[in-house]
């Protein structure tokens, strides 16, 4: 199975200030990318192939609980039909990242808006 991790424009804009604040974040995100390639459905399921991942920010020194949250949307495509039908190509879209100390939880409305925004811009 081929897994691609894709950064959305929204994720990129939310990431910018965090990169300035936390010098370890690039390395932490590389670890996350590796983990997502191994397990695209990493984190807590929020329904409809959307997941919330607790990300440790090493330079914060607070572990996963005080780190960042990453919202992902997983898309799978079947390439070719064989006897065993399974997704052959998976894309993990990084929709949002936020510092847990700045934002407690993402609301259902914010989540729906994120997905709607992604679906509008990805077509």
Regions found by a protein language model. Give the residues of each.
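Enriched for short, Lys/Arg-rich terminal
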Residues: 68, 73-123
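Non-catalytic, surface-exposed connector residues within folded enzymatic/regulatory domains
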Residues: 5, 23-26, 47, 65, ...
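A structure-centric signal for secondary-structure junctions around beta-strands
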Residues: 2, 47, 65-68, 89-91
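Arg/Lys-rich, positively charged N-terminal/basic patches that mediate binding to nucleic acids
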Residues: 1-29, 123
């Amino acid at each position: 199975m081929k897994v691609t991790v894709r950064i959305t424009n929204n994720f990129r804009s939310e990431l910018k200030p965090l990169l300035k604040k936390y010098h370890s974040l690039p390395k932490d995100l590389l670890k996350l990318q590796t983990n997502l390639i191994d397990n695209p459905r990493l984190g807590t399921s929020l329904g409809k192939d959307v997941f919330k991942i607790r990300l440790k920010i090493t330079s914060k020194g607070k572990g996963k609980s005080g780190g960042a949250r990453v919202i992902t949307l997983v898309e799978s495509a079947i390439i070719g039909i064989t006897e065993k039908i399974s997704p052959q190509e998976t894309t993990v879209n990084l929709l949002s990242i936020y510092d847990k100390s700045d934002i407690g939880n993402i609301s259902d409305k914010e989540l729906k808006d994120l997905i709607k925004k992604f679906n509008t811009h990805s077509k």
